[in-house]
Amino acid sequence: PYTTLFRSYYFCRNSTRRFFAREGMVCVAGSWIAISFFGCLPFVFSREIPNFVDALFEIVSGFTTTGSSILGDVEALSPGIMYWRSFSHWLGGMGVLVFLLALSPNGERGKGYTMHLLRAESPGPNVNKLVPKMRTTARILYVIYMVLTFINFLFLLLGKMPVFDAVCTAFGTAGTGGFGIRNDSIAGYSPYIQNVCTVFMFLFGINFSCYYLLLVRHVKEVLKDQELRLYIIIFVVSILLITFNVRGLYGSWEETIRHAAFQVSSIMTTTGFASTDFDLWPGFSKALLLCLMVVGACAGSTAGGLKMGRLLLI
């Protein structure tokens, strides 16, 4: 499926004329259509999802990290298809073209094409250069993305999660998409696994530029980041409000806080994992979760929603 993407990408790359923002938008839109079309073919050819429209819906949901599904029984899928379904989240989380930019060799043909492709593809209101070259910025972003995913995977393994489950869950967490490999999502796993997912969903909702600043020891800049502060404040306050609102539904404070924190982290980052049936929660908690879903997490993260940066502007 990547043949078309690479051809269209290098066609743009080797062009000698100036590359403007609108061309970047067209390349990104065309690439998303192409990869969605080819990405659904494994579902169709394997007969796991024989209907083309259903298969297209499923893979588009994966690449866009939406998380909606037409499947009634996820556990009936073969391991290979289950892996591809989860991997689509990981690819789509940071953006397929950002991935291609990160892999591409250096070169400066087609003035401005790298900058416009990265800005058109990256999540959030804007994307800033971490280093002078935009392609190097793309590589830094993806290295951070891969390292966080791997650390997430290791922590899941420490909780005695099966390797295959840990890989697929790490993909869904990193892309903040929420495709699970169990019908009950994360509810069937141990409290430790749920807590790990809570932490990493929150971490993937932070602007990736903050991680780079931490790596280069610009800690003060991270601490002064208004968007990050707002994200943490809303996250903590929401957990407290929901904890006290649903405290009578669970047997202990630990269980109450765990489910409240998990669902706030999941919904706020638009991941969509579930540790409990929150449809049974009081109206206040469900309304708060709905608001968190709309607001989303930080710009420059893999999360969806309006984004904290835009909320600050409003």
Spans of features found by a protein language model:
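Membrane-proximal intracellular helices of multi-pass ion channels
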Residues: 1-314
